[in-house]
Amino acid sequence: MSEVTHRTKTRPVKVGPLTIGGNNEVVIQSMATTKTHDVEATVAEIKRLEEAGCQIVRVACPDERAANAIADIKKQINIPLVVDIHFDYKLALKAIEAGADKIRINPGNIGRREKVEAVVKAAKEKGIPIRIGVNAGSLEKKILDKYGYPTADGMVESALHHIKILEDLDFHDIIVSMKASDVNLAIEAYEKAAKAFDYPLHLGITESGTLFAGTVKSAAGLGAILNMGIGNTLRISLSADPVEEVKVARELLKSFGLAANAATLISCPTCGRIEIDLISIANEVEEYISTIKAPIKVAVLGCAVNGPGEAREADIGIAGARGEGLLFRKGEIVRKVPEETMVEELKKEIDKIAEEHYAKMEAEKAKANA
């Protein structure tokens, strides 16, 4: 293939109840930071990720203790569980048997062909996919010897090698990631991969850094990739609470119109005209809407003169003035509210719009099932 395979044209792959690929949705993932064998801590963290909007979660499986915990974890969570395996095919078999919704392996590094065959056979029987995880930092020696250092071509060659191992065993429920910590390398690798095969792509800039630096780096790299129509699922990798990964992912997808059920905040950068504590209000509203699963655009603006006009596209918003605020919908002023209650009034209006959306969705669902 010489053209980029758009995300809508990729091969659909089921992960639990979700479909990755074959549509325009980009599914948000994260990874638990807990020791997987600590079931209570792992489940608690996954529950926080679920609440933040994470749709798929991955856990490490470095040993038998971790593998033995998978079944208990799976029973207590509501989103698909991916198990990350390196080298030991027996751990992959245990994870599959325990109910993993997907496993992440590189077929070429778990041993002889019969070991790969055993994993593929188990995955087929359970109907679960395999993610091939190519990483610029851990390319095979023969590829590094060939190219001299990690390159996009080398990463694609590695991916195709692992894909062929699975395809030769008549296994096609495959998702591929092409991660690198270098932004330009990642962009090039994903673009070349999207031209080389039509399997769904899991996006990520690996080892991107701390909350601030990693957010900027991930947004720069993944934004460029998403803008090419590439990517079916993604994880923002941060040295931070994984809930922050989900928040950043949601904001990134919203920026490209790829998050259908997420609220968006518009807020002004402030200037000498503002008469309210806009920064703290904007932060409070942003936190409030972070878990709302409805396509609501909310505005928080500091100037009552220009505010409503500037946020004409917002569903609901407030513009501050001295001692009061203007509450408006679609750019039209609804009413004036006292400054001390304007945030609470805004929250009430947000809730109303969200409830209207939920009711509409339920009605459409009922009609479709009738």
UniProtKB/Swiss-Prot annotation:
[4Fe-4S] cluster binds at residues 268, 271, 303, 310. InterPro entries: Dihydropteroate_synth-like_sf (IPR011005), IspG_bac (IPR016425), IspG_bac-typ (IPR004588), NO2/SO3_Rdtase_4Fe4S_sf (IPR045854). This is 4-hydroxy-3-methylbut-2-en-1-yl diphosphate synthase (flavodoxin). The lineage of its organism: Bacteria, Bacillati, Bacillota, Bacilli, Bacillales. It catalyses: (2E)-4-hydroxy-3-methylbut-2-enyl diphosphate + oxidized [flavodoxin] + H2O + 2 H(+) = 2-C-methyl-D-erythritol 2,4-cyclic diphosphate + reduced [flavodoxin]. The keyword ATP-binding does not apply. Its EC number is 1.17.7.3. One of its GO terms (biological process) is isopentenyl diphosphate biosynthetic process, methylerythritol 4-phosphate pathway. The keyword Iron applies. Binds 1 [4Fe-4S] cluster. GO terms for molecular function: 4 iron, 4 sulfur cluster binding; 4-hydroxy-3-methylbut-2-en-1-yl diphosphate synthase activity (ferredoxin); 4-hydroxy-3-methylbut-2-enyl-diphosphate synthase activity (flavodoxin); iron ion binding. Pathway: Isoprenoid biosynthesis; isopentenyl diphosphate biosynthesis via DXP pathway; isopentenyl diphosphate from 1-deoxy-D-xylulose 5-phosphate: step 5/6. It is an enzyme of class 1 (oxidoreductase). Pfam families: GcpE. Converts 2C-methyl-D-erythritol 2,4-cyclodiphosphate (ME-2,4cPP) into 1-hydroxy-2-methyl-2-(E)-butenyl 4-diphosphate. Keywords: 4Fe-4S, Iron, Iron-sulfur, Isoprene biosynthesis, Metal-binding, Oxidoreductase. Belongs to the IspG family. Its cofactor is [4Fe-4S] cluster.
